[in-house]
């Protein structure tokens, strides 16, 4: 910072959230990494400015007013998280990923320092891209193994973590991998994780979660989360990290790979919608959508209904709770004039209209679902 000032951010790599007090200019300067892997909260009210990696750190300050941000309840009840900088605590905000701030003489200024851009080099062949991705992936894994303590890996039965473990094992054959499962085998991934670790010769340290421990842990889990977050995957992750902490202090995981490499089914579905849009005029698609919606269920109905919608309207995740505002609002005492779940994401889609639909979905996920749910859960539980 002393050498480059704010320009230092262009030289940083990896995950971070920090604040630096510049005593020469009496300015507080801080930033958060480009994906928002590490959390950064702040509270700016009544002449107070507080910041921390956890909201609970503010509770000790006498100037902090603890209030429920009830206007955000509709979002929480619809999509299980708040898709913007607000939190469930009134006046407590998240510094967005890829943003920096300065605080001077009571004035807070926030600005973006990095934007995710998509520039496809059409001259490269598929083989060229495969080679480039493999080399970049290997270099990234190697770079993130640099530590002054032992580094381990989380391992599920999925492609993402398996690739990471396999890459680490090339240079560190006896790297410890960690996996968690359930007592009920039909829900457990342990047999697959153990089979893979055995195949590549890596030790796999496991633990299991039963129904009693699942529910008993919830009180601790909610305390660590700071905000209500009903993603059930946080429970096994809590037990996984708790077990791993007995052996290592640093782990690599496969979080974020679906958003980067198009792993979610809705990305491939978007390719089919693109083809449908090319072949069928918009007015016809909208007419077909209206007719299909009124008919009893039949094979392909869901596709035809969504095929007449805008991209942001058919952005539906599996974790939507109440899709119909009327159904949701009957559980709320006040009328918050809240939106349908997909409407919360329209401003994000508006920023990337120039991209094809699958890439739009990836971009929106990186700036909402990944940032405010996936990465937050991973940080809190670890």
Residue ranges and their predicted role:
Residues 359-378:
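Alpha/beta-hydrolase fold catalytic core
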Residues 8-10, 32, 89-93, 229-230, ...:
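Short Gly/Pro-enriched turn/cap motifs at secondary-structure boundaries
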Residues 4-8, 59-67, 86, 123-124, ...:
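Short, polar/flexible loop-turn hinges at active-site or ligand-entry regions and domain interfaces
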Residues 10-13, 33-35, 92-95, 244, ...:
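A short catalytic or substrate-binding loop motif that flags glycine-/basic-rich loops and adjacent residues
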Residues 1-26:
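Catalytic core of PPM/PP2C metal-dependent serine/threonine phosphatase domains
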Residues 23-50, 118-343, 377-382:
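ATP-dependent adenylate-handling active sites, centered on carboxylate activation for C-N bond formation
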Residues 21-127:
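N-terminal segments that mediate ammonia production and transfer
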Residues 342-350:
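A short, charged helix-loop
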